[in-house]
Amino acid sequence: MLTSGIILLSGGLLSPNPGLIFWTAVTFVIVLVILKKIAWGPIVSMLEEREKGIQSAIDRAHTAKEEAESILKKNKEMLAKADAEADKIIREGKEYADKVRSELTEKAQVESQKMIAAAKEEIEQEKRRALDVLRNEVADMAVKGAEKIIRTTLDADKQKAVVNDMINEMAAKRN
């Protein structure tokens, strides 16, 4: 403790020494001049180059962002056009399918009406043929019956027997 008291009384560490201050300032100025002459230029130029590089990177980033936004806008427009085209194609396909379906339905109806008309005509012709055949058979039966009646004079029992014989003959011919 005694030594620390002596240092404090004789000026010590905290008391300013004008000679030391002067030489410290001179040394600082010399170092500053040397640094300015030797190192300041390269440091400043390096900082300027760094600043230019950063600014260039920022500019490139802005340009890339603008290009990306432009491409995105074009892509959205192309997608919208593609969607519109797809909707148009789908709509046209549905319209075409509806048209084809209605044409096929109409053709089928016309064909079915033709087939029905042809079938009715064929049935009518068969009916006429059957009636003609029936008329001919009835006429033949009437002629044969009249012929038999004329050949024989019949009483009621004989007439019934002749008619039954004729009916049986006709039935046998049909089968």
Curated annotation (Swiss-Prot):
The chain crosses the membrane at residues 20-40. GO terms for cellular component: plasma membrane; proton-transporting ATP synthase complex. It is a single-pass membrane protein. GO terms for molecular function: proton-transporting ATP synthase activity, rotational mechanism; proton-transporting ATPase activity, rotational mechanism. Keywords: ATP synthesis, Cell inner membrane, Cell membrane, CF(0), Hydrogen ion transport, Ion transport, Membrane, Transmembrane, Transmembrane helix, Transport. InterPro entries: ATP_synth_B-like_membr_sf (IPR028987), ATP_synth_b/b'su_bac/chlpt (IPR002146), ATP_synth_F0_bsu_bac (IPR005864), ATP_synthase_B_chain (IPR050059). Pfam families: ATP-synt_B. This is ATP synthase subunit b. It comes from Chlorobaculum parvum (strain DSM 263 / NCIMB 8327) (Chlorobium vibrioforme subsp. thiosulfatophilum). The lineage of its organism: Bacteria, Pseudomonadati, Chlorobiota, Chlorobiia, Chlorobiales. The gene is atpF.
